């Protein structure tokens, strides 16, 4: 069965994405860079052909021979006004071959010309290989998506590209239809439904209105702007910072291609950050003539820079409604597609236009189309699993998420492979007396010690009222939403003071390979980790016992119940152990255990005499596990069991 699996491919203008339906759910497949979307770029050099990330990464060095936007050419005539106007903006050459456009490049020292279908087929081949690498066997069957407004020749040309790539194209389906399938809107079974798909991608903006009745999809209207997308928002940011650089440093970087390219990459990253944070910082070393460019931008400023572009997205929505002869109150579902729909302002404008209606956005917007294509592919291959009949979307956290407790121990709140969205809360406390604050350091990874894991971010919770160690209660909450965005909040229960950090699933975090490597390494290191964990645990137990004994015999309530000689004996021994601990933080587990036995031999007889005399507070009740003590600079947190 597994061998004749079918994949779903979203062949995008700027990015493509591939998914497969297996084990009862859709899996969006990451490429060798760990990215779940792959640039629709093909580059030709003196020595090789590059596709995807590798092609996009070298575009600044090789602009004439790096081809993108093939989707704007496919199935069109050379004389088409669209082709003529687009040609003005491309760094690569487009030539006329019998009124068919061809892209001319230099490859291995020769001049070559390729049809758009050939360029698209190279991207499709890449997507096919990404799926094969993941599934571990050859894949031939595929469903490929196209915009709803594609005409027959554009559809046929896309199918041809699939054939050139060695695919058996089961069906070409509309992108908005795929998105609606992804959300299972064809299975609500409530009679006819009108669905508006708002698709704002990297280079294009499409609005489609579909009517779904009993599993039948009908496109009622399409509208949009073939030249509006994420790249335009990047351009606004680039222009803004070019001007800022002029003001700050009296230099114009706009003619330096490499500087502008580096600035653009930083702007794209800042734009993504601003979807989940209200501010983003850019740090570009030696951007131009050795000048470092460090700056920041707020979400409000970004929204202002792009306000006319954002507002212009509503015009096609109104046009599509008019064409479909529908009133906005007659739309049942609103679906967001395309990475740019993550921008909060875009969501708000659409939501306000529809009088506060909820938006369907639980599936990653860049992945919704490939997701639906994968479901359609499974159906066409005759997949009978009931999940295809009623599909439920469940994403998972790929790595454990937690924080550092005393001694550098990784304390996981969200275990790997937990389904998201999810929320976990745990109580921690202070590690030293009168500690004024705690440093919350958030890590991801599978190792026992945080130094072997990946630091995602840190923040401090200060203003904790003075109290003995172990008394304050700090509630830490890890909350991941459906987009994989993590919010960590720490609250001091006594004062209600809180602080938080938001960590977005920036694709630059860890690739699938790194996750695999971490998991495999974790197996290998498990034994070492276990030894280390036991060592820290033994150290903490000893330290805890020594401090507890010390405070027990110093307790005012014991005055007169314990002889000064006994008290001195306990205090001296405790002090000796505490000093030894400071000098031997890296001792082995059995040394810590041996020291603890020594200390117990001194303390136990005295404590038991005390009990026979009075039944005072027992030191044993302090829990051998004790606080997760340890070295390390700055305020630390420990876990309360």
From Swiss-Prot:
Keywords: Acetylation, ATP-binding, Chaperone, Cytoplasm, Cytoskeleton, Methylation, Nucleotide-binding, Nucleus, Phosphoprotein, Stress response. Residues 617-633 have a biased composition (Gly residues). ATP binds at residues 12-15, 71, 202-204, 268-275, 339-342. Signal peptide: none annotated. Residues 2-386 are annotated as: Nucleotide-binding domain (NBD). GO terms for biological process: chaperone cofactor-dependent protein refolding; lysosomal transport; negative regulation of transcription by RNA polymerase II; positive regulation of microtubule nucleation; positive regulation of proteasomal ubiquitin-dependent protein catabolic process; protein refolding; regulation of mitotic spindle assembly. It is found in: Cytoplasm; Nucleus; Cytoplasm, Cytoskeleton, Microtubule organizing center, Centrosome. The modification Phosphoserine is found at residues 631, 633. The modification Omega-N-methylarginine is found at residue 469. The modification N6,N6,N6-trimethyllysine is found at residue 561. Induction: By heat shock. The modification N6-acetyllysine is found at residues 77, 108, 246, 348. It comes from the Eukaryota. The modification N6,N6-dimethyllysine is found at residue 561. The modification N-acetylalanine is found at residue 2. The modification Phosphothreonine is found at residue 636. Residues 617-641 are annotated as: Disordered. One of its GO terms (cellular component) is cytosol. Residues 394-509 are annotated as: Substrate-binding domain (SBD). Component of the CatSper complex. Identified in a IGF2BP1-dependent mRNP granule complex containing untranslated mRNAs. Interacts with CHCHD3, DNAJC7, IRAK1BP1, PPP5C and TSC2. Interacts with TERT; the interaction occurs in the absence of the RNA component, TERC, and dissociates once the TERT complex has formed. Interacts with TRIM5 (via B30.2/SPRY domain). Interacts with METTL21A. Interacts with DNAAF2. Interacts with PRKN. Interacts with FOXP3. Interacts with NOD2; the interaction enhances NOD2 stability. Interacts with DNAJC9 (via J domain). Molecular chaperone implicated in a wide variety of cellular processes, including protection of the proteome from stress, folding and transport of newly synthesized polypeptides, activation of proteolysis of misfolded proteins and the formation and dissociation of protein complexes. Plays a pivotal role in the protein quality control system, ensuring the correct folding of proteins, the re-folding of misfolded proteins and controlling the targeting of proteins for subsequent degradation. This is achieved through cycles of ATP binding, ATP hydrolysis and ADP release, mediated by co-chaperones. The N-terminal nucleotide binding domain (NBD) (also known as the ATPase domain) is responsible for binding and hydrolyzing ATP. The C-terminal substrate-binding domain (SBD) (also known as peptide-binding domain) binds to the client/substrate proteins. The two domains are allosterically coupled so that, when ATP is bound to the NBD, the SBD binds relatively weakly to clients. When ADP is bound in the NBD, a conformational change enhances the affinity of the SBD for client proteins. Belongs to the heat shock protein 70 family. This is Heat shock 70 kDa protein 1A. It comes from Bos taurus. The lineage of its organism: Eukaryota, Metazoa, Chordata, Craniata, Vertebrata.
